[in-house]
């Protein structure tokens, strides 16, 4: 059982079709009063932080059943989950770091150079939309429960997160939200279809909702998970593929925006796949429409089945909730015109029989139990209710420009012995030019594969290169770091133990949750006042790169004061403890000149998803002056 599968499926339709099973499934993903994060890249939480998708399923179940006992349980679980997340977040950052929701095979979507540590420190558009939704829904839950004061707190958090999402993910040049922003500040401008649909459905997209949907790139057989595709990954899974549950969310967004043409495309994609395969496959190849040539697949996939329910419940029939009412707002494309029946649908104490005739998104007439009425049904209604809707045929809107076709990206540029004076990189096939960025900001454009750097560079600069042509671009290259002479030092580990009672041997230390290995002290270091980044060289081979729940966490203490929690995710395959990597950075402000102490400690904040295995090998700290 997967948290995200259950949650997305519940919101797509299982909360209506099978409420008891949905409740049991949602409850099964709660442990210790918080939502369980699915296993994933680098050992799961907090590299993966999309467990808050549970809120979508929990709220959908409440809407369909009206059970206040369930609502109290769900609100308590979500509040505790957000509190646990907050304990390991970077100080002062509104956005939530972590990998992209559900697109959790690193090699399929992320730049090749990014490690699990890099992903843990990056910011994904889709994951942040979920965190916004979670706070939005938790505020609504608390208002339903009469706790307006706490509801206001989460509503304010949601508003702050919405503003930050717009600020950090919106691309003015592309007029859409980018898929991901690296820890270094570079925006990956690929389109994430699920995230875009969710942003529309929760109101985050605002006036951009319809243009975003109308310009979602399409393949021959549906809306790809993301575009442009990653060109060097030929096998389809998240890359080069259509997932019916994602298409269902895109369809629901299109129906809400009364985009009948787009809805027809999504419906056709989903119905063709189900009929062609004789089952609800998890995914299929975007360009061939085949399900046999993807890396991993399955029949009767839960969220694909739920997506088909969503097609009818929320797409074609347009069922949605508004305050204390159920509203029927059909979206029937012209190619699906005719009569459509939905009978025996149980919502709270009602049983609905809905009949729609015609096509379009505008209602001509409504009959409720044989009498003229409106398509708005109070949620406290009881008994069997028959609803007849006649739609008003509408002329096709003025033809829009065709949506962009899905395309491939360019390969990432590779460095060719760059120096602090001259950046050099290898030519990228198909590239017309290159964009050079410094510290997350555009720095230069180059037709050739080099760029001369200025003599005065400050304490630290970081450069990356992007290949571009008229049709597409590449992901950013691995950052090239240029610390000034003397601005970067390595600090050796010195003593380990609850009271630092043991000397470190051979320059490395084993850390786990026992008292004798719960604290590691480094040699004192002379520093001037300024801003510094702190990283640690570590090894975590508790499980594979892609799986598990044993991401290690340690609190960084500077002069005895917490500077944040360091994430030390799996960096190699299970058992390969000789392979070391560099952690993501924590930024530290040093106020006074003199000797300063650094230590890594296991504290209550560092409890991981596993709860028991929380281990790693560590070597030096890397301390770099930034300002």
Protein language model annotation of sequence segments:
Residues 1, 20-45, 90-123, 163-243, ...:
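Extended glycan-interaction surfaces of carbohydrate-active proteins
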Residues 219, 253-422:
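Non-catalytic C-terminal accessory modules of carbohydrate-active enzymes
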Residues 479-627:
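Extracytoplasmic
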Residues 420-430:
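Conserved aromatic anchor
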Residues 364, 433-436, 554-556:
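Short beta-strand elements bearing conserved aromatic residues within extracellular beta-rich modules
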């Amino acid at each position: 059982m997967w948290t995200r599968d259950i949650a997305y499926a519940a919101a797509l339709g299982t909360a209506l079709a099978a409420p008891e099973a949905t409740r049991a499934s949602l409850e099964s993903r709660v442990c210790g009063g918080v939502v369980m994060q699915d296993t994933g890249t680098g050992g799961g939480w907090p590299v993966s932080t999309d467990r808050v998708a549970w809120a979508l399923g929990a709220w959908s179940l409440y809407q369909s059943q009206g059970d206040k006992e369930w609502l109290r349980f769900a609100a308590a679980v979500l509040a505790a989950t957000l509190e646990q997340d907050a304990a390991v977040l970077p100080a002062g950052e509104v956005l939530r770091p972590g990998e992209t929701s559900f697109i959790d095979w690193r090699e399929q979507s992320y730049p090749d150079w990014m490690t699990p540590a890099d992903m843990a420190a990056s910011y994904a558009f889709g994951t942040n939309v979920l965190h916004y939704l979670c706070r939005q829904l938790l505020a609504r839950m608390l208002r339903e429960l009469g706790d307006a004061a706490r509801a206001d707190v989460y509503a304010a958090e949601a508003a702050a997160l919405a503003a930050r999402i717009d600020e950090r993910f919106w691309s003015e040049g592309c007029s859409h939200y980018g898929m991901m922003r690296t820890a270094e500040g570079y925006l990956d401008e690929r389109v994430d279809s699920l995230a875009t649909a969710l942003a529309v459905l929760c109101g985050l997209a605002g006036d951009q909702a319809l243009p975003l949907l109308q310009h979602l790139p399409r393949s021959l057989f549906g809306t790809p998970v993301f575009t442009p595709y990653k060109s060097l990954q030929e096998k389809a899974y998240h890359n080069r593929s259509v997932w019916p549950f994602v298409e269902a969310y895109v369809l629901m967004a299109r129906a809400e925006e009364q985009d009948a043409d787009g809805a027809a495309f999504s419906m056709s994609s989903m119905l063709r796949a189900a009929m062609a395969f004789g089952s609800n496959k998890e995914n299929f190849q975007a360009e061939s429409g085949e399900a046999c040539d993807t890396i991993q697949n399955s029949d009767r996939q839960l969220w694909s089945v739920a997506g088909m329910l969503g097609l009818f419940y929320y797409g074609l029939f347009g069922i949605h909730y508004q305050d204390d009412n159920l509203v029927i707002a059909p979206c029937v494309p012209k190619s699906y015109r005719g009569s459509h029946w939905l009978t025996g649908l149980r919502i709270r104490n009602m049983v609905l029989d809905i009949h729609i005739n015609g096509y379009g998104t505008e209602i001509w007439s409504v009959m409720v139990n044989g009498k003229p009425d409106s398509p708005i049904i109070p949620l406290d209604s009881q008994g069997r209710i028959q609803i007849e809707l006649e739609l008003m045929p509408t002329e096709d809107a003025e033809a829009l420009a065709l949506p962009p076709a899905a395309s491939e990206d360019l390969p990432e540029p590779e460095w060719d012995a760059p120096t602090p004076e001259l950046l050099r990189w290898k030519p990228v096939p198909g590239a017309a030019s290159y964009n050079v960025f410094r510290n997350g900001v555009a720095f230069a454009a180059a037709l050739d594969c080099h760029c001369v750097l200025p003599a005065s560079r400050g304490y630290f600069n970081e450069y990356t290169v992007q290949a571009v042509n008229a049709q597409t671009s590449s992901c950013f290259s691995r950052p090239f770091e240029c610390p000034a002479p003397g601005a970067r030092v390595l600090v050796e580990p010195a003593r380990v133990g609850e009271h630092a009672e043991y000397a470190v041997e051979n320059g490395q230390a084993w850390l786990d949750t026992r008292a004798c290995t719960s604290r590691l002290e480094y040699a004192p270091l002379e520093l001037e006042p300024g801003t510094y980044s702190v990283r640690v060289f570590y090894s975590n081979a508790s499980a594979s790169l892609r799986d598990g729940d044993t991401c290690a966490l340690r609190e960084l203490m500077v002069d005895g004061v917490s500077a944040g929690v360091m994430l030390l995710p799996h960096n190699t395959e299970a058992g390969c403890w000789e392979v070391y990597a560099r952690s993501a950075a924590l930024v530290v402000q040093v106020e006074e000149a003199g000797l300063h102490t650094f230590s890594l400690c296991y504290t209550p904040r560092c409890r991981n998803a596993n709860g028991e295995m929380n281990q790693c090998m560590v070597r030096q700290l890397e301390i770099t002056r930034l300002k």
